[in-house]
Amino acid sequence: MCGIIGIIGGEAAAPHLIDALKRLEYRGYDSAGVATLENGKLTRRRAEGKLKNLENRLAREPLAGRIGIGHTRWATHGRPSENNAHPHATEKVAVVHNGIIENFAELRRELEHRGVKFSTETDTEVIAHLVTEELKRGAPPVDAVKSTLPLLRGAFALAFLFAGEEIGRAHV
């Protein structure tokens, strides 16, 4: 089972995201990652294995954003790997997900038919691409999510981080 967390604060979010994810370690996981918003741009770090691997990566490549989302992954679609670790992102949105998107293969085929390129084996990546399509059509972030949710079948929890969003606005 996955763990998801979102933080909005007055200082760098990544250390707090790691602390929060440590509290979720008992749930089990095979990889972890965080994304933050820095100067309106999404940045993320991911690692396979234990949170210590992600902590080491963040020590080498810190994130300064004060708003962020984090995730510990227990693989349901796609093998454990850094590439399949959450958050999944496009240039416009990062998403973390707990649950299963039962119709992800169908959605993925539809997106690929429209020219969308996938970089993971996960069901979660379809969510990022569907929301991005809505954003490109001019939908505000909340409306992009509202338009995407009815397309998804399954049981799930989601947290999003949007590029260009001001500090203090997250959608969990």
Indicate where each model-derived feature is located:
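Conserved short alpha-helical segments that host acidic/polar catalytic motifs at enzyme active sites
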Residues: 1-171
